[in-house]
């Protein structure tokens, strides 16, 4: 009877693994294990193959059996803990690490413990563990960058990642983290530089991943969630590219970024991709988008912005009852996932449906606080200009733009209360009070124009409409009829 040690089987298995045909190798190895349940070679290769197709639960089962059959081999205990960690079984992974008793594996053990604590959002414990590593260890710089980023220190995180890049050379995950840091700093051109490098290397080095073929209309099969795909950081890079295009209001570019990524079946999609698909296509496929976002909320982990985006999109599409239900059913998520601004805004918006006067008062309080903050930033900007401090000017301007967006959002929601009552004089009054901070904003100008038009103040309305129309001349198409 043939065994895994037989030359024919060994050559076949190793060729399949070399060609990255892990699923076929798994099929043969499972057949061998049915005949020889304690075969060390079969279990070891099977664990390796499962790990590479990211079936970490089955990989963990293989390595668990190996730790029982060969307790003297400390590497199996490490592989078992790594597989549990990758499967999201963090307490079990920590327990498995305690079984390790090898000075040679101590550094790897500390690094894995650090990753576990980071994923458990125990950042202080992760930092303490990380400090056990030598400061010149490239992984120290990489992981310290992650902790700095998590702490909101994006510039410091970026510097840490760039230092690690100099030592380690090109790594897709490291380049992605640098791009993410630049994205958080609103430096989109630099972020796109690193994203482009990830994508171009992926196209050049992994033609089997069918990058961009779906966008071109070519029918392609799923490439699966292999470890190779994970190591290229392509999915993360395309999602970040989509986010940047979305922020730049280039919806077509955002959609293409999602279809350019290596193709996978619906059930293979990760939570971030599902979230971005829902968000970017919400106007064309609202029902599908809401379904995806609601589904994500049921998962043990989901993108942090999912909860807020679902509530805001329900409100945007005037599904206020659904928004209220989601908020009530997930009250425990509000503190963790909603900023005070978003929570207050949603509370006022939902109040509009039953008590518009009370809602107006809530919006007015928010508007007053934002006005104070905008004036403070205006003063800081003037001081930075006098001091010719370019870095401070840049930071303050970014903060001002974000705050102005929030202010205009509150202002429009407040004005809509009177717009719905056709009290256009009151709407105009609200807009006039906000001219100090909004007179350069096209959204504000357009709504001012609308309310003037509704009051038959056509000449004044044209004064607001005309600059906006001229700005968008290139988008106008003419008919020959």
Mark where each language-model region is.
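Alpha-helical segment of the N-proximal tetratricopeptide repeat
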Residues: 5-35, 45-48, 52-55, 112, ...
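Residue-level recognition of tetratricopeptide repeat
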Residues: 14, 48, 82, 115, ...
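Position-specific recognition of the canonical hydrophobic site in helix A of tetratricopeptide repeat
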Residues: 17, 51, 85, 118, ...
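Residue-level detector of the short coil/turn that links helix A to helix B
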Residues: 20, 54, 88, 121, ...
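Solenoid-like repeat scaffolds
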Residues: 30-36, 64-71, 98-105, 130-137, ...
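TPR alpha-solenoid repeat register
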Residues: 42, 76, 109-110, 140, ...
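Canonical tetratricopeptide repeat
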Residues: 45, 79-80, 112, 143, ...
């Amino acid at each position: 009877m043939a065994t895994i040690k037989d030359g024919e089987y060994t050559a076949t298995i190793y060729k399949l693994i070399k060609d990255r045909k892990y699923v076929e190798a798994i099929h043969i190895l499972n057949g061998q294990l049915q005949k020889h349940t304690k075969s060390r070679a079969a279990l070891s290769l099977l664990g390796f193959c499962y790990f590479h197709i990211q079936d970490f639960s089955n990989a963990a089962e293989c390595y668990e059996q190996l730790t029982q059959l060969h307790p003297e081999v400390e590497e199996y205990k490490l592989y078992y803990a790594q597989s549990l960690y990758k499967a999201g079984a963090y307490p079990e992974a920590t327990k498995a690490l305690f079984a390790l008793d090898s000075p040679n594996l101590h550094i790897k053990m500390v690094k894995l413990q650090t990753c576990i604590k980071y994923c458990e959002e125990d950042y202080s414990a992760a930092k303490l563990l990380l400090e056990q590593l030598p400061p010149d260890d490239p992984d120290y710089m990489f992981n310290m960058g992650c902790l700095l980023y998590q702490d909101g220190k994006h510039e410091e995180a970026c510097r840490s990642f760039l230092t690690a890049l100099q030592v380690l050379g090109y790594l897709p995950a490291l380049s992605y983290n640098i791009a993410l840091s630049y994205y958080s700093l609103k430096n989109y051109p630099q972020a796109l530089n690193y994203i482009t490098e990830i994508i171009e290397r992926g196209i050049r080095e992994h033609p089997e991943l069918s990058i961009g073929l779906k966008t071109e209309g070519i029918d392609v099969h799923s490439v699966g969630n292999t470890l190779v795909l994970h190591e290229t950081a392509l999915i993360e890079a395309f999602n970040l590219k989509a986010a940047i295009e979305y922020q730049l209001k280039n919806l077509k570019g955002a959609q293409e970024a999602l279809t350019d990524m290596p193709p996978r079946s619906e059930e293979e999609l990760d939570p971030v991709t599902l979230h971005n698909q829902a968000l970017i296509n919400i106007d064309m496929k609202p029902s599908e988008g809401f379904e995806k976002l609601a589904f994500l909320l049921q998962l043990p982990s989901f993108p942090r912005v999912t909860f807020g985006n679902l509530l805001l999109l329900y409100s945007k599409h005037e599904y206020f009852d659904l928004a209220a239900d989601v908020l009530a059913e997930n009250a425990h998520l509000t503190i963790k996932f909603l900023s005070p601004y978003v929570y207050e805004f949603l509370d006022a918006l939902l109040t509009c449906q039953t008590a518009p006067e009370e809602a107006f008062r809530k919006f007015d309080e928010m508007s007053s606080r934002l006005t104070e903050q905008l004036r403070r930033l205006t003063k800081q900007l003037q001081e930075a200009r006098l001091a010719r401090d370019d870095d401070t000017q840049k930071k303050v301007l970014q903060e001002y733009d974000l705050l102005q967006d929030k202010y205009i959002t509150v202002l429009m929601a407040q004005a809509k209360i009177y717009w719905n009552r056709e009290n256009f004089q009151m709407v105009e009054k609200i807009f006039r009070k906000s001219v100090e901070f909004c007179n350069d904003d096209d959204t504000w100008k357009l709504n001012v124009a609308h309310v003037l038009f509704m009051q038959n103040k056509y000449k004044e309305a044209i004064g607001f409409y005309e600059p906006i129309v001229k700005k968008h001349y290139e988008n106008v198409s003419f008919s020959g009829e």
